[in-house]
Amino acid sequence: MNHLYSKTNLEEMLEAGVHFGHQSHKWNPRMAPYIFSERKGVHIIDLIQTSNLLHEACDFLANAASNKKEFLLVGTKFQASDLIKSEALKSRCHYVNQRWLGGMLTNWMTIETRIQRLKNLETQEKLGAFHHLPKKDAAHLKRQLNQLQKYLGGMKYMKNLPDVVIIVDQQKEIIAVQECRVLGIPIIALVDTNCDPEIVDIPIPANDDARSSIRWILSKLTAAIRDNRF
């Protein structure tokens, strides 16, 4: 990493608030190697470590993208939801940004049938089929369509299990983490000072609550994917 890039990188991270962890009494001791100091009862993340691990993650994603791998972005907390969707769309990735439904990966065959149902309902609506049904039936199908779009819309074009999963807020998305571990799917995750870095493949120590921090990290990860797709 050249010195100028490293300096700019650190300045950008400071500006985005990437270094602010949680209150020190909420920490996970396994995050100790990634903590720089404590200030006014709040842990400060070591941004040199963040930078190094972010580079490792970007290299991994760039290589995966060049080999035509598929990616799933997961982040359902309100600070991350719209950022997950916009970054996923820009980089042609799949995403979950509303709620992780148990079994989304480990019960993939069932999820596949729900995705097919979503596509069928979208086709019916587009063709105007709902207009030919009794109002009650049409309203029921419309509600069903809205629900499926809300929870599965970001996975609509996912034909198989993803090759890599990127997660914002490991604690909130712990079920997604567990499913990936069961299936052996590599996980890249933002890990705040209250997280366990040992249960993901590439942990990126970072503030996972501030939108500015989430946006900054996500933009780097998805750029690595976008710039290396063919």
UniProtKB/Swiss-Prot annotation:
On whether Membrane is a keyword of this UniProt record, the answer is no
Q: Which domain of life is it from?
A: Eukaryota
Alphabetical GO CC annotations of the entry are:
chloroplast; mitochondrial small ribosomal subunit
Keywords carried by this UniProt record: Chloroplast, Plastid, Ribonucleoprotein, Ribosomal protein
Family matches, as CDD domains: RPS2
Where found in the cell? Plastid, Chloroplast
Q: What is its main location?
A: plastid
Q: Name one GO molecular function term.
A: structural constituent of ribosome
| Swiss-Prot/TrEMBL GO biological process terms | translation
Disulfide bond annotation, renumbered to this chain? none
Q: Name one Pfam family in it.
A: Ribosomal_S2
SUPFAM superfamilies in UniProt: Ribosomal protein S2
InterPro entries hit by this protein: Ribosomal_uS2 (IPR001865), Ribosomal_uS2_bac/mit/plastid (IPR005706), Ribosomal_uS2_CS (IPR018130), Ribosomal_uS2_flav_dom_sf (IPR023591)
NCBIfam families attached here? rpsB_bact (TIGR01011)
Q: Which family does it belong to?
A: Belongs to the universal ribosomal protein uS2 family.
> What protein does this entry describe?
Small ribosomal subunit protein uS2c
Per the UniProt record, the source organism is: Chara vulgaris
- High-level lineage: Eukaryota, Viridiplantae, Streptophyta, Charophyceae, Charales
Q: Which gene encodes it?
A: rps2
